[in-house]
């Protein structure tokens, strides 16, 4: 694929050089192409218009390095074939990336007006690639008559308007998440071969179609439109995330030809959730405008270079005024869309101002309520502390009451036990008293009986002694003899 695209590019450039040689036969200032590296931007755009390689960055040479004219190098008799020398590609610079994107977005033809040559894109590619930044490839006029196709010089107003409208279209396409929706919405125009248009000294417009157009160029252009749409959407999403995230402020700059000053929208970080759609739209506009301004500056540098007059005597072709009319209509439609978006942004700005005013009022009203809330919060904390203290004291008292109740229950049990013991002792004492009385009664009875027995015994003993004495006396009297003398009585 790469070899075919490079060979087709070299063959198209060879054909153009042969046509130029046959038309002029003599070079203007004798300057030659230096091993395929030409300082003329139009020749490079022409050679890479139909077969630009996808994903491969291409670098523009500086406008002032070489002269404005060129001529093929003569070697002996005839022309020398172009010999391509591989260049050192710089992939990291932003200028090369943007230039490659500009080429991939469909820079197609070179138009020449008042000694200057430019490139013009076919209407189908123009319509298909409206979703990207470089879809509408126009050159900003710098006051020296740099016109499109030799007539109706467009100023930077159309370019800026187209850039902003393309940004809106890209926003819609990103929301729908469909690449094919942009192609489906774009009007289709019958495809024709890309001409190289030049104007002679007499004002005649002559066109020469390139001879060798390969069938793969159509596929390349369609893939370029799709890849440009995807790359722009990725680039836009990346810039929207990185844009001015520190202070939360976004600014929207108006286009150059509108004459309106820059307007800025200051958003607060607290309302970032509500402002996401608006900030995304504004960031997309700013990113698209920056990319478009860079492309316009590059086109101005290309247009300010002196161009050779090698294409003065080529065959005529039909004038592309209908295409210009369609482009103007498209630009007007895009400007209308831009006005609508501006009105929507103004409405959103008014809504943001209303929200800010309401927030400021709420802040002032919150100033007094905060003190009340703080007092209530302080009272709440004090009440909670008191509640904790009381709850703890109540818990302690409850525990003490439980202990006292337990002690009372124990005391009651002890009193019951003691009362029971006392009852038992009293019953025992009563029993003992009864026994004592019984014993006393028994003792009295025993003593009475003993006394009676003692009296009886003593009476018996006395009686027995008396009897004994009488008996003894009787015995003695019998034993003893009776005396002889008589005692006188």
Swiss-Prot record:
Chief location of this protein within or outside the cell: nucleus
Tissue-level expression: Expressed in seedlings, roots, stems, leaves, and flowers.
Stretches the record annotates as Disordered: 49-73, 195-264
Domain of life: Eukaryota
Motif (Nuclear localization signal 2): 83-84
Transmembrane segment boundaries: 460-480
Motif (Nuclear localization signal 1): 80-81
Motif (Nuclear localization signal 3): 104-105
Keywords in alphabetical order: Coiled coil, Membrane, Nucleus, Transmembrane, Transmembrane helix
GO molecular function term, any single one: protein homodimerization activity
Entry coiled-coil feature ranges: 323-446
Biased composition (Basic and acidic residues): 215-224
GO cellular component, one term: cell plate
Database matches in PANTHER family: WPP DOMAIN-INTERACTING PROTEIN 1, WPP DOMAIN-INTERACTING PROTEIN 2
Comment, domains: The KASH domain, which contains a transmembrane domain, mediates the nuclear envelope targeting and is involved in the binding to the SUN proteins.
Function, in words: Mediates and enhances the nuclear envelope docking of RANGAP proteins mediated by WIT1 and WIT2 in the undifferentiated cells of root tips. As component of the SUN-WIP-WIT2-KAKU1 complex, mediates the transfer of cytoplasmic forces to the nuclear envelope (NE), leading to nuclear shape changes.
Protein name in the entry: WPP domain-interacting protein 1
Species, as recorded: Arabidopsis thaliana
């Amino acid at each position: 694929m790469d070899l075919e695209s490079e060979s087709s590019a070299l063959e198209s450039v060879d054909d153009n050089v042969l046509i130029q040689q046959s038309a002029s036969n003599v070079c203007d200032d004798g300057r030659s192409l230096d091993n395929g590296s030409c300082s003329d931007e139009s020749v490079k755009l022409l050679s890479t218009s139909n077969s630009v390689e996808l994903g491969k960055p291409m670098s523009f040479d500086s406008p002032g390095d070489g002269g404005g004219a060129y001529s093929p190098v003569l070697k002996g008799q005839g022309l020398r074939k172009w010999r391509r020398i591989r260049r050192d590609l710089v992939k990291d610079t932003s200028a090369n990336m943007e230039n490659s994107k500009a080429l991939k977005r469909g820079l197609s033809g070179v138009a020449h007006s008042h000694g200057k040559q430019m490139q013009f894109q076919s209407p189908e590619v123009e319509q298909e690639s409206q979703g990207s930044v470089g879809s509408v490839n126009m050159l900003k006029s710098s006051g020296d008559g740099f016109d499109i196709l030799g007539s109706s010089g467009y100023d930077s107003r159309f370019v800026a308007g187209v850039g902003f409208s393309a940004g809106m279209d890209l926003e819609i396409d990103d929301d729908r998440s469909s690449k094919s929706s942009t192609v489906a919405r774009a009007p289709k125009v019958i495809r024709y071969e890309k001409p190289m248009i030049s104007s002679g000294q007499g004002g005649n417009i002559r066109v020469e179609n390139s001879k060798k157009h390969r069938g793969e160029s159509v596929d390349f252009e369609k893939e370029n439109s799709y890849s440009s749409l995807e790359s722009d959407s990725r680039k836009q999403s990346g810039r929207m995330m990185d844009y001015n995230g520190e202070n939360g402020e976004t600014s929207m700059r108006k286009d150059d030809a509108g004459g309106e000053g820059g307007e800025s929208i200051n958003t607060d970080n607290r309302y970032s959730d509500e402002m996401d759609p608006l900030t995304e739209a504004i960031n997309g506009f700013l990113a698209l405008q920056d990319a478009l301004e860079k492309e316009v500056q590059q086109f101005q540098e290309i247009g300010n270079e002196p161009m050779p007059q090698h294409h003065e005597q080529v065959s005529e072709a039909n004038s592309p005024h209908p295409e210009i009319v369609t482009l103007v209509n498209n630009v007007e439609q895009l400007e209308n869309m831009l006005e609508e978006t501006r009105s929507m942004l103004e409405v959103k700005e008014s809504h943001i101002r209303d929200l800010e005013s309401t927030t400021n009022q709420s802040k002032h009203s919150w100033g007094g309520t905060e003190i009340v809330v703080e007092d209530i919060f302080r009272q709440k904390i004090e009440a909670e502390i008191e509640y904790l203290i009381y709850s703890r004291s109540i818990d302690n008292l409850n525990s003490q009451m439980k202990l006292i109740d337990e002690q009372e229950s124990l005391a009651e049990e002890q009193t019951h036990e003691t009362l029971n013991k006392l009852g038992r002792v009293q019953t025992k004492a009563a029993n003992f008293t009864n026994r004592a009385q019984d014993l006393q009664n028994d003792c009295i009875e025993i003593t009475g009986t003993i006394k009676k027995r003692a009296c009886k015994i003593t009476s018996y003993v006395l009686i027995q002694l008396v009897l004994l004495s009488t008996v003894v006396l009787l015995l003695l009297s019998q034993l003893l003899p009776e005396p002889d003398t008589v005692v006188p009585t």
